[in-house]
Amino acid sequence: EEVSGPSAPAIVEYLKERGVRPAMVVDEGGAVVDGVFPGVKQPIAVVGIGEKGFMNVELTARAAGGHASTPAVPSTLGMLCRAVADCEKHQFKAHLTAPVRALFQNVGPYAPFGLRLVFANLWLFGPLLPLLAGRLGGELGAMMRTTMAFTTAQGSKQINVLPTEASAGVNLRLVNLDTPESAAQHLKDVIRNDKVEVKVTYAQNASPYASAEDANWETLAKAVGDTWQGSIVSPYLMMACSDSRHFSAICRDVYKFSAMALSKEQRGLIHNNDERIPVREIAKTVEFFTRLEQSI
């Protein structure tokens, strides 16, 4: 796997120069999952029609250093910790984007009555969306808003020395209604401290959306449904990032589907210790792509 490397952009540029425009692109993304949608017992085959943007930000607090025996208040770490806590307390606003709306409309009829009523009348229950996002949490909640995850931190290298700088890294995944600029401004507005710098170190916008209504979608959805019979096939918003986004420059319908059934436990093993795929799922993956290619 190449992470943010030069290969995919180079391939796209090569095809563009030669006038090649693929009718459809299928890359890694969603899977056949269960336990994601509250109260829905059937497995759901989620196919990404778009993916979130990606953004890295470094928060840096600065103040006078010194010896730990005579500490200054507020310290750089104190200011940084307050900034992190304020950011986590003030999450981004939830949005009903096109992929999420499609997911709710497709899966909603299989949900318990209360949720079914909400998803069948999204035009009416829109104001409940922020509350719903918070209560759903996990993967569904993350699909509805820009998320932020604090992942790195650095202060003094000596326990008895006050650092003049303390920093924390935060990774954001952006829905398409948030931009790197607006997301950075949100962090600044929440932190409200000129001594804490908000520096964007890397950013890319969310991808365009593929169609979930044209002939390409119908062909893909049928191949998925015929391979994993009994599953609910639905569009969704992919929360991770992939190199397939580059192909949006030459192809409208870029779909993100890993073509295998993955339990919650198996999804948790992705990029983790003991990552693995059952052999039987590899066979289903081959079956799916064979069926898809024969139907085109």
PLM regions with names:
Residues A61, L172-L174:
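Hydrophobic beta-strand positions in extracellular immunoglobulin-like domains
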Residues V40-P43, T60-H67:
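Flexible glycine/proline-enriched surface loops and loop-helix/loop-strand junctions
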Residues V20-R21, K41-Q42, G50-N56, M143-R145, ...:
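Short, solvent-exposed loop/turn segments at the edges of secondary structure
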Residues G29-A31, K41-N56, F257-R267:
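Flexible glycine/proline-rich, aromatic-decorated loop/lid segments
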Residues A8-L15, A64, A68-K93:
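A short core secondary-structure module
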Residues E1-V46:
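Acidic/histidine-rich catalytic neighborhood of metal-dependent amide-processing enzymes
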Residues V33-D34, K93-N160, T164-E165, N176, ...:
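An extended, acidic, His-containing surface patch that forms the Zn2+-binding/catalytic region
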